[in-house]
Amino acid sequence: MKTTSFILALIISISIGKAQTNHQVSYFSLQDVKLLSSPFLQAQQTDLHYILALDPDRLSAPFLREAGLTPKAPSYTNWENTGLDGHIGGHYLSALSMMYAATGDTAIYHRLNYMLNELHRAQQAVGTGFIGGTPGSLQLWKEIKAGDIRAGGFSLNGKWVPLYNICLLY
């Protein structure tokens, strides 16, 4: 009986494994998905309206300021002016990119290009290819390059998560 049970379990295991190996994950683009009238479409439209309600000049302000340029508008408050400056701008780029890919909305496309152009202005002003919104980030990276590295739980050389801030842009 034990032998029969073992053989049966083995056959079932092999069969399941064989069946599963024939399936492959296939990727698709967001533009290949169209939402029908549903709570999902409603949520997407709510997101779209929120994204367009944000001021790109306020979101690009930390990057322009750190590049020595005069921002067109003041930064948003809270995290955008207390040491984590620029991180919402990084999230905003992702939101714009994904919303454009999902909807093809031209207002989103123009907003994305505007943000990228403002970041390009900041990058050109710095002259090294760097873009950053963290206050004092240019000095921070000079310190790192010189080997002066003071890492903390959420900080690097006294700056609040500058690597996180960079990864949001790239």
Stretches found by the model and what they are:
Residues 1-21:
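Bacterial Sec-dependent N-terminal signal peptides
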